[in-house]
Every structure is written in structure tokens, then in C-alpha cells.
Amino acid sequence: MLLEPARRSLDGGKVIGDTAVPVTGDIADHGAEAEYEEAAEILTAPFPVLTCPGNHDARPAHRKALLGDAPGDGPVNQVHHITGTTILMCDSTIPGRDEGRLDARTLDWIDTTLTALTRDTPALIAFRQPPVELHHPLPDSGMLEDPGQLAELLEAHPQVAAVLTGHAHTAAASTFAARPLIVGPAVTWTLRMPWEGDRPADRDQPPGLAFHVLDDDRRLTTHYRVVL
């Protein structure tokens, strides 16, 4: 997460109403403790800023600087209850690799957390790597591994309204486990699709963000914006 684009994206999220900002990973670039200390300052806001690790992150430093916890190597999973909606921020990282996986501990945590909710409490699940192909060789080489395990788990939890991910550096929408799958836009550089030219990275695009609106019918509507 580069500092100035991150500040601009967070400022763009300061809207009136019941607001929380999920950040699906890559809080740091190199996993250095100093990067997280800077990020902690930027991510301080008058509304909840929810984070999970990405493939560039280091769990011990993430825990210490952003959560105030003792450093540890286990998955960094958190649950947040925001004005009637439960948001599960899940750790899908495999240390040292771009691909992701929700390991047995995390899948069990997701199941236990959702089981504890009433069926009329809507939930969102967020993690780093998309569980489906986005039809670009770069993000598709670093997808979530074994996504069928999560899909099977979600069959027992109809209160999950949508799945939110990042990682791809391009805003995208698809479906997963009969639910909306929303991929957040890039804060730093934007991925160019194969039909947009030979250069894979467009570093001139401004940072982006997505506004998610979850209504009383559990319908998720997403509006994408760039921050100029």
C-alpha cells in the first residue's frame, strides 16, 4: 500500500452513514514493521477500517502494528459487527506465495462464526485472492486454491450475502457459490486486460474504491469510483 494513494482512497470513503472500510490485504509492500507503523497512522479513521493480510504482508508485524496483538504466525482472522451486518475478514495468505488458501483453521473459524449468528443476520466474507478466474493470466496465476471447500461451507450458511476480495488490481464482479463476488479496485497501479494493450500495469490510473450498499433484502449493490 503506497502512502499517498492509500490516504486518498481512505478519504474517499468518508461518507455519511453507517460506514466501514474493508481492506483486503497488501497493507505493506515488503512486510516490514515500519510499513505497518505508517499504515496504522493512515488507517486511523472515525469509522472502522477492517483489514486482513495479503500476499505481501507478514502476519507478526500485521498483528502487532494494526491489531495491538502479540506477534504470531497463525492466521489473522477477525469478525466485526457493523450496524446489523457481520463482516468476516479472513486470512487466505500462504507465506511466501502469491496464491491463497483458506486453511483448515480458517475454514473452521468461518463455520463456527457463521453458525453463531442468527439466520436473519446478514454477513459478508472478505479475503485476499479471488476464488474464480478473472480471465487475465496474472491474477489467475495467484487465485485462491481449493475454492470448493469454501463453496461447500457456504451452502450451510444462507445469511452470507456476498464475498469480497482484492489482489487483482482491477475492479471486477463475478459470482461464487451462488453469491456476488466483488473484487476491489487498485489503490496503487491498475491491471490492463489483455485487450487493452501490451503493458500489464497502468501506473497512471488514480486509486479506486468501491462503495458497497447492503439493503434490507440482503441485496448488495456496489458503486466503483476513482479518487482524483
Question: Where do the model's predicted regions map?
Answer:
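N-terminal active-site segment of His-dependent metallophosphoesterases
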Residues: 1-38, 134
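His/acidic metal-ligating clusters that form di-metal
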Residues: 8-20, 100-180, 208-211, 218-220
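Hydrophobic/aromatic beta-strand patches that form the interior of the parallel beta-sheet core
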Residues: 22, 50-52, 88, 164, ...
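Active-site metal-binding loops of divalent metal-dependent hydrolases
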Residues: 25-27, 55-56, 92-93, 129-130, ...
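Extended active-site neighborhood of metal-dependent phosphoesterases/phosphodiesterases
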Residues: 32-119, 149, 155-159, 177, ...
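Active-site-proximal beta-strand elements of phosphoester/diester hydrolases
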Residues: 84-94, 124-128, 179-185, 223-225
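Short acidic, glycine/proline-rich loop/turn micro-motifs
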Residues: 92-93, 135-139, 193-196
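Binuclear metal-dependent phosphoesterase catalytic core
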Residues: 153, 175-228
